[in-house]
Amino acid sequence: MTERLEVQRAIAADQHAIFRVLCDPRGHVAIDSSGMLMDATGEPVSAVGDTFAVHMDREALNDYPMGLYDVSVRIVTLNPGREIAWTIEGQLNLGHVYGYRLEPIDGGTLVTSYYDWSSVEQSWKDAAIFPVIPESALRATLGILARTVAPGIARPETAAG
């Protein structure tokens, strides 16, 4: 069984405009398709180790009745304009990583969204809670990201179509 999901979308926007959204705590809330992110506080991130708070409500997933809770997002990879990744710290520090890679293409940026839970302890993997977010949610978030940075603009063509 895979322990990583990756999805891609060509977006008709400059990679730096996209990266600004991904570095802004409120940007994470604005593009979230899971319905769990309610609000975020903190400054835009600029380095590995930077953190911000996200106010969560897991009700949208209809799986575990956690109520309202806060997590800390800690940046684990940051290459300006190219890649950003983070892990979640909070009630449980499981070690799963979310991220985006940005690649310039004609007419915009190819954005890869990924979710990796390969470093999670086996006992949590055995609990069958991963992936927490399905591939469809990653795809939907890319659609919302596109709408946020390039509203009404058609996707650029890629080699894959």
Segments predicted by a language model, with ranges:
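Hydrophobic beta-strand positions in extracellular immunoglobulin-like domains
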Residues: I11, R58, Y115-W117
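Glycine-rich portal/gate segments that line the openings of hydrophobic small-molecule binding cavities
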Residues: A40-E89, I144-T158
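A short, structured loop/turn motif at beta-sheet edges
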Residues: A12-H16, E43-V48, V76-R82, R101-L110
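Hydrophobic ligand-binding cavity/cleft-lining segments
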Residues: M1-A47, G161
